[in-house]
Amino acid sequence: MVSRRVYRPRDLFSLMQSTLATENFFISACEIDIIDNFPEIRVQAEVSARENRVRRFGGEPEVLISEIYDEILKKHPQLSPATVEKIIDLEIQMEKIVLYKNSRGSCLFEKAISDGCKVILISDMYLPSAILKELLTSCGYDISNIPVYSSGEERHSKNSGKLFSIVKKNENVDIASWMHVGDNVHADILNAKKLGINTLHADWSEYNHGVSNHWKAKDIIGESICKALLLKQVSAFHQNDPLNEIGFKVFGPLLLGYVSWLANQLKIHKIDKALFLARDAHLIYKIYNEYFSEEHVKCEYLYISRASAYMVGMTDWPMHRIWHLFGGKNKKSIKK
């Protein structure tokens, strides 16, 4: 029903890290090593919380987000409970930012509702059902009268198959008329089939669950967002032809990144007005106006000949660039 705008689910923690490192509250409330290592701290806290759950109570390693952050508080007692609550709130807000309605999942959901089917949402997730409802609502779903089950709350998962049994009992579901839709082959498809539940594999959605190579990428968030454009679910956002796909996956991110940098430079250097020169800067000008027109830096599209523009910038060019422009079969002087 929803997808994320990042390549790996855990890249959300890197996005959180950027906020921890720039907002004054977190800078003053968190020690530098916590901010610098937050993605790994958050991942390891979840591992510890699940292990401790099994050690203390047996059963499945299903936990809630509050229990995950309890582990962070244990290992970093210098953090106040109030600060930890703020970080939990930040994680939920970041989920709202990266989540969006999946078009295929949305169509199935709306069709089921219009056909009068009883819809039940089941998630293997550490977020409580109330937060899951909040996230789905922020993505545009009306789920006010729809039951939502969280493995963290129920302490049983689809991964073990036991969450299906809980839903069947609580909702009085007839197995013969139950159709379960999910993207995880083991948890959503194989385990459901073992119980006699009809299934539909949501193969239109995918994620990479590998580990981020933070030491290789200078901008882990930018890398994650760009790689997310290669996932199946984003095909709904571009036409199915090679040129549109190349524009969406390659040149779109490239130009948007460049214009984002340019807009930031204009602010840093307190530029009053930016001139975008015809015709090479036409697309850059359009992108700037579309996404950065509220940056309070005036801009104008200026018609100018390439020849005069070359002369202005020639001092910054390397020799091979000058030779490329003015060399050729016919001898040319700089004047020509």
Outline where the language-model segments fall:
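Asp-based phosphoryl-transfer active-site loop
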Residues: 1-8
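A metal-dependent, Asp-based hydrolase signature
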Residues: 16-19, 29-90
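Substrate-recognition element of Asp-dependent hydrolases with the DxDx(T/V) motif
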Residues: 84-139, 147-150, 273-280
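Gly/Ser/Thr-rich loops at beta-strand to alpha-helix junctions
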Residues: 125-129, 185-186, 252, 275-284, ...
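Conserved Lys-Pro-Asp/Glu-containing loop-to-beta segment of HAD-superfamily phosphomonoesterases
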Residues: 159-186
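Acidic, divalent-metal-coordinating active-site segment for phosphoryl/phosphodiester hydrolysis
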Residues: 184-199
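Flexible inter-domain linker/hinge segments
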Residues: 206-258
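Long, charge-dense
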Residues: 297-335
